[in-house]
Amino acid sequence: MKSKYKFLGIIIVGIIVVFILYIALNFRWHLVLKDNKVIEYKAGLVDKNIRNLTIYIPEGTTEIMDDAFSDCKSIEKVYIPESVKIIHRRAFIGCKNLKEINLPESLEKIDRDAFNGCTSLEVIRIPENVEYIGESAFSGCTDLKEISLPQSLKKIKEMTFYGCENLNNIEFPQNITDIEMGAFMGCVNLEVVKLPDTLSHIEGYVFSGCKALREVDLPNNLKYIDDATFNGCTSLSSIYLSDSVEELGYNAFGECTKLSEINIPDSISQVGAYCFEGTEWYKKLPVDSEGLKYYKHILFQATYNMEDVLVPTEITVIAGGAFMGHDELKRVVLSDRLKTIGGYAFSGCSNLYNIAIPETVRYIGSSAFSNCKSLENISIPENITHIYGNTFENCEKFQYIELPQGLEYIGKEAFKGCTLIKNTLIPKNVKQIDDGAFSMCINLENVEFEGEPLYIGNSFYDTKYYNSIKEDEYSCKYIGNHLIELVDKKREKVIIKDGTVSIANKAFSQSKIREIVFSKELKMIGESALGHCYRLEDVEFPDGLIYISKLCLIDCRNLKRVYIPKSVEDVGESILLGSGNVKEVFVSKEIAEKIDFYKNVKVRYID
């Protein structure tokens, strides 16, 4: 009996000891460290309601890992030792009370979303050794007023400073070559921007919504200003474009309501729709007797909805959307000096039936003739190398289309819904035909290829030609050496035939596939190609694969292991989105940096 009570007493004492240890370990915050890396911050029991914690990261630490301090709202200050080289993805994301952090001179890399949503951070100095700052690294830092960028920085990634509402000044490094999409979008107090001459391209939305921006110094070597780059910069009154500028994107300066002074150099060869819409300068442009609003060599807009239009001979550029929606327009005579037709230029001109594109034209933008339902035939100039997305979509009266011999690319849904086309010849130089390029051309029955494109995808879906393709023994449809569809979605195993170089978008999507044996020649895998394959557990892509498109393995809920060979040069966004049970990924370090992994994934780098 005594031994029984003695045993019970030991158990009780053991429980008390464990409880005391738990309290001791969790009373105050502590860091989880492994191999000189901060893996995780654990808040103590008394820390959870405190708002002014100071964190000291120990000497010798080399990296702060993904999500290490994510959403730690109690932290106000962080001191990082000189040994730290990398701050990984989302390391301090959502630390809303973080006001002060020192970045050591040893630091080389700040990864994507590292300080996203740190709304109390006011000043930050980035050391000179930092060569990489990832996407959205400081996005949503609404109190950030000052930031110094190192001269070592070459690129400012997309959305890096998006929504930094109090940022009023920034000095750009003299070696910057690229500013990516939306980098300073919504920085409503940014007043002056002086860009270095090393910059040749400003991507879309970079300064969109910067309402206080009053002065912009553009680089002398700038060639491209992309879509909506300065849209909504309502304090900007003048802009100088050098002779190097060639392209202005959609809405590039749209709604810059005070913009009244701008020079248009002769070098400009492409102009997107609504480029200067809402500006004082554009409002003052005169309209000629034909209702055409143009300046120098650029036709911006046809303001009258007329049956016949004669484009002036001096016009070499028709801006995007110039005649869009003109349902009265029937006949257009283009200038024989014309070089470019912008996107959506004649989109929705439902009664247009007569237009001859001169051989001088080198560029036709996306959707340029979409929904021109009366247009019977059109001759595409031999200078055209790219036919972009939706260019001739729903041109229902097209009976035949002759593609130029120099053509290299046919975009997504370029000829979708051209229901009368029966035959087409794909020239030998075509390298890529994007998905839906000829979809819903219901009478298309004969397609000939002079060459061997690298990617075809679901280009011919819902055509007689597509329906005539026979399935192989594994229920797969092929066009040449391209796998375009797994027809029987209940099939559990597929061996892809030798020589196959591409797999189309969604080819295996929502199937019950468990095992895929890829061809050794495979080079490209399309968007969502293996998406929603709930029974798939292991994927080993073949050596020699070059590109994996975005969302390739989306929502493969039971996927455990993925092997991505070192031959892969690039991957699209979110290839593992929703595949939260992946335990192990073999991949090169370079490609791993482009993939968002869930926290429980073991990433094993391959040489």
Label each region the model flagged.
Residues 1-16:
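N-terminal Sec-pathway targeting helices
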Residues 12-27:
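N-terminal type II signal-anchor transmembrane helix
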Residues 25-36, 48-63, 73-86, 96-109, ...:
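Structural signature of tandem-repeat unit edges
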Residues 38-39, 299, 483:
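Hydrophobic residues embedded in beta-strands of well-ordered beta-sheets
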Residues 45, 65-68, 88-93, 111-116, ...:
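Consensus positions within tandem repeat domains that build extended binding/scaffold surfaces
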Residues 576-577, 596-598:
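A structural signal for leucine-rich repeat
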